[in-house]
Amino acid sequence: MNLHEYQAKQLFARYGLPAPVGYACTTPREAEEAASKIGAGPWVVKCQVHAGGRGKAGGVKVVNSKEDIRAFAENWLGKRLVTYQTDANGQPVNQILVEAATDIAKELYLGAVVDRSSRRVVFMASTEGGVEIEKVAEETPHLIHKVALDPLTGPMPYQGRELAFKLGLEGKLVQQFTKIFMGLATIFLERDLALIEINPLVITKQGDLICLDGKLGADGNALFRQPDLREMRDQSQEDPREAQAAQWELNYVALDGNIGCMVNGAGLAMGTMDIVKLHGGEPANFLDVGGGATKERVTEAFKIILSDDKVKAVLVNIFGGIVRCDLIADGIIGAVAEVGVNVPVVVRLEGNNAEVGAKKLADSGLNIIAAKGLTDAAQQVVAAVEGK
């Protein structure tokens, strides 16, 4: 779950980290009033969406008058911002952030993620602030400096100083950087985050460090113990199908193809998408119904998949372990009948009571194709899309 920039900065303030004074606004009038609260300009106005690349898309602007602030707010509030990180529809702009402009001398980068290979929280710092860190990692990886947090001791001040020295910082900037490093690490661990990023972390012309931007990603599996973060969730920024799937504990990710996929198990779901592509098809989604593939969840999964107008066929791939395939077949038959599926449905069942389940599908009289194996399922669903 991602947070908006203004929400990230509110969290920074609670932990004593330096950030520009700013206010999130939902109307042009609020935006003008925010400028008055901040004081003399110039100000920076920023569209609040869960996507990068806002500046290049016109969603960030430095302004010198309250009239310009009102014009920016009137232009963007209620509209959608399209960036290189969004789809063609963009993201809705429901708030803009008005904050004091900062005199920038130098831009740095500081962020942290959970590194699965080392099984540690890893902090990354670079002198290449203001640039996508993925681009820096690809083109100039030697400019990214890393430290890993020990899960027993947690963050240590010497690690912050180590990064500061590698960035070429001196004097009070080393102390300021170390404080920010320790604060971010504390936020990351206490708030169950999956990602934290300040890009850019700037050195002002007055010689101080300030968090000019903020990006936080919370671990969705830990939100039950982070009620205040859960309240910050903005579902308008999420794919509505993904939000609907989450309510039914379905793992759904929309893709660009035309073959809907419904599978139990994340690994099997990825393998299913691979074999569909191997046979010339394009998956329309990743959807893992999990171990409890009940009729109700299967029905809901069909509704979500078919809400995508691009879907021309559906492949259901179920491995029956604890769950019996004949019960899954009953669920599929009931779901197809209830939802009114008008596209071909190819079903591959394997495991516990698979033969009984396949017979039920064959005898149902519905437009359901029972596949004999995974390869056969992929070939049949691709052929169905091609009208063969």
UniProtKB/Swiss-Prot annotation:
SUPFAM superfamilies: Glutathione synthetase ATP-binding domain-like (SSF56059), Succinyl-CoA synthetase domains (SSF52210). Keywords: ATP-binding, Ligase, Magnesium, Metal-binding, Nucleotide-binding, Tricarboxylic acid cycle. Its EC number is 6.2.1.5. Transmembrane segments: none annotated. Residues 9-244 form the ATP-grasp domain. One of its GO terms (molecular function) is magnesium ion binding. Mg(2+) binds at N199, D213. ATP binds at K46, G53, R54, G55, E99, T102, E107. Binds 1 Mg(2+) ion per subunit. One of its GO terms (cellular component) is cytosol. It is an enzyme of class 6 (ligase). PROSITE patterns: ATP_GRASP, SUCCINYL_COA_LIG_3. One of its GO terms (biological process) is tricarboxylic acid cycle. Its cofactor is Mg(2+). Substrate binds at N264, G321, I322, V323. It catalyses: succinate + ATP + CoA = succinyl-CoA + ADP + phosphate; GTP + succinate + CoA = succinyl-CoA + GDP + phosphate. Pathway: Carbohydrate metabolism; tricarboxylic acid cycle; succinate from succinyl-CoA (ligase route): step 1/1. Heterotetramer of two alpha and two beta subunits. HAMAP family: Succ_CoA_beta. Succinyl-CoA synthetase functions in the citric acid cycle (TCA), coupling the hydrolysis of succinyl-CoA to the synthesis of either ATP or GTP and thus represents the only step of substrate-level phosphorylation in the TCA. The beta subunit provides nucleotide specificity of the enzyme and binds the substrate succinate, while the binding sites for coenzyme A and phosphate are found in the alpha subunit. Belongs to the succinate/malate CoA ligase beta subunit family. PANTHER family: SUCCINATE--COA LIGASE [GDP-FORMING] SUBUNIT BETA, MITOCHONDRIAL, SUCCINYL-COA SYNTHETASE BETA CHAIN. This is Succinate--CoA ligase [ADP-forming] subunit beta. It comes from Escherichia coli O8 (strain IAI1).
